[in-house]
From Swiss-Prot:
One of its GO terms (biological process) is fusion of virus membrane with host plasma membrane. Homotrimer. Interacts with the inner capsid protein VP2. Interacts with the outer capsid glycoprotein VP7. Interacts with the outer capsid protein VP5*. This is Intermediate capsid protein VP6. Intermediate capsid protein that self assembles to form an icosahedral capsid with a T=13 symmetry, which consists of 230 trimers of VP6, with channels at each of its five-fold vertices. This capsid constitutes the middle concentric layer of the viral mature particle. The innermost VP2 capsid and the intermediate VP6 capsid remain intact following cell entry to protect the dsRNA from degradation and to prevent unfavorable antiviral responses in the host cell during all the replication cycle of the virus. It comes from Rotavirus A (strain RVA/Cow/United Kingdom/UK/1975/G6P7[5]) (RV-A).
Length: 397
């Protein structure tokens, strides 16, 4: 894997810097490095593809070295270099695709394609060994079963979940009280609602709670907490739990009271915040518990009182909500996030070449399915294919 990264980095640098008019002295070190790559690869044969519709391709390396010059690089020099660069780039691209479409239930962190297995040989270590990529560093750590650490921006840690629970209901669905939520990606939105605006509740107050368990532990997380859930701030028609009917949700938004968010690890509270909004942090956690209250306003103008009558019919629903958004965090496991396209790269290649469903990943690389059942086998394979996707992205956008 590190050899593949070194190949890609050398080729990227060569493609960017070996251009007509450049002083040879400015790129002499790069050209020596490029020549070392050619010397190491010459005489070797590789085969890629042969799975799904990914065609079989044979690769033979027999290239001349780039020479030295006292002057600027001329058009002939650059054209010779370009021909070599283009072939090598095409080779790396195909090795990456071949690796991205393969999976294994056992030791999925290790190279799965014949071409990458061959590149893992000791003879290829002479190719500008470079271990500076975060993905490569973590791949090496995971390969040795040592602790890894990825930094993510808006990590897709929450499987998609959108539903509601009713703490008070009746067949007519005209006096409901409960909680509805939407968890997806890096965001939780949860709302508590009461048709009667807590008119008969103790102290005219309704208590709500929402607990979310993560599939992986997050550490050093920067989080935004807001006293609102905008996705539940407009009217909608909702299917009943049994699917037999529908009911009307017509919210009027109030500010939540006694808001508390707890971050837990293995059932132990690590961080707690009360009535604190904006930016907060959590050290390490695998569970988030949100609790908040809806309090009936003790004093109301006639217009507000008309929204929340003392008896049925209730045409509006008093609603309070919270939004929790994970802005950044560190995780030992690889995840899809907002700043990278690894999941899209892997999925698009597998779709383009009609790769059959294997023993590890769900059909279509469905992320909700994948993260919901994030087994050690999936973790190993995902880290490997994401690492390869990061290497490919250096050369192919």
């Amino acid at each position: 894997m590190d050899v593949l990264y070194s190949l890609s980095k050398t080729l990227k640098d060569a493609r960017d810097k070996i251009v007509e008019g450049t002083l040879y002295s400015n790129v002499s070190d790069l050209i020596q490095q490029f020549n070392q790559m050619i010397i190491t690869m010459n005489g070797n044969e590789f085969q890629t593809g042969g799975i799904g519709n990914l065609p079989i391709r044979n690769w033979n390396f027999d290239f001349g070295l780039l020479g030295t010059t006292l002057l600027n690089l001329d058009a002939n020099y650059v054209e010779t270099a370009r021909n070599t660069i283009d072939y090598f780039v095409d080779f790396v691209d195909n090795v990456c695709m071949d690796e991205m479409v393969r999976e294994s239930q056992r030791n999925g962190i290790a190279p799965q394609s014949d071409s990458l297995r061959k590149l893992s040989g000791i003879k290829f270590k002479r190719i500008n060994f470079d271990n500076s990529s975060e993905y490569i560093e973590n791949w090496n750590l995971q390969n040795r079963r040592q602790r890894t650490g990825f930094t993510f921006h808006k990590p897709n840690i929450f499987p998609y979940s959108a539903s509601f629970t009713l703490n008070r209901s009746q067949p007519a669905h005209d006096n409901l009280m409960g909680t509805m939520w939407l968890n997806a990606g890096s965001e939780i939105q949860v709302a508590g609602f009461d048709y009667s605006c807590a008119i008969n509740a103790p102290a005219n107050t309704q208590q709500f709670e929402h607990i979310v368990q993560l599939r992986r532990v997050l550490t050093t997380a920067t989080i935004t907490l807001l006293p609102d859930a905008e996705r539940f701030s407009f009217p909608r028609v909702i299917n009943s739990a049994d699917g037999a009917t529908t009911w009307y949700f017509n919210p009027v938004i109030l500010r939540p009271n006694n808001v508390e968010v707890e971050f837990l690890l293995n059932g132990q509270i690590i961080n707690t915040y009360q009535a604190r909004f904006g930016t907060i942090i959590a050290r390490n956690f695998d569970t988030i518990r949100l609790s908040f209250q809806l309090m009936r306003p003790p004093n109301m103008t006639p217009a507000v009182a008309a929204l929340f009558p003392n008896a049925q019919p209730f045409e509006h629903q008093a609603t309070v909500g919270l939004t929790l958004r994970i802005e950044s965090a560190v995780c030992e496991s690889v995840l899809a996030d907002a700043s990278e396209t690894m999941l899209a790269n892997v999925t698009s290649v597998r779709q383009e070449y009609a790769i059959p469903v294997g023993p590890v990943f769900p059909p279509g690389m469905n992320w909700t399915d994948l993260i919901t059942n994030y087994s050690p086998s999936r973790e190993d394979n995902l880290q490997r294919v994401f690492t390869v996707a990061s290497i490919r992205s250096m050369l192919v956008k």
